[in-house]
UniProtKB/Swiss-Prot annotation:
Taxonomy, superkingdom: Eukaryota
Name of the molecule in the record: Putative uncharacterized protein PRO0461
Length: 63
């Protein structure tokens, strides 16, 4: 289950992803130009590995 929302008329795209193993843990993806930042919303379990997003998911524009 993944959800991505794009800002209208804006150069910055913000996407919200939920990991399937931990639905309560959501990650926020902030696209700045060609680079992106992964920001975990919850920092309760630092020992958990962040969700691995493929290039097709983190790519700002789809071909």
């Amino acid at each position: 289950m993944e959800e991505m929302s794009y800002g209208e008329n804006s150069g910055t795209h913000v996407g919200s992803f939920s990991c399937s193993p931990q639905p309560s843990q959501q990650m926020k993806v902030l696209f700045v130009g060609n680079s992106f930042l992964l920001t975990p919303v919850l920092h309760r379990q630092p020992h958990l590995q962040p969700c691995n997003f493929g290039p097709e998911v983190v790519a700002p524009q789809r071909l």
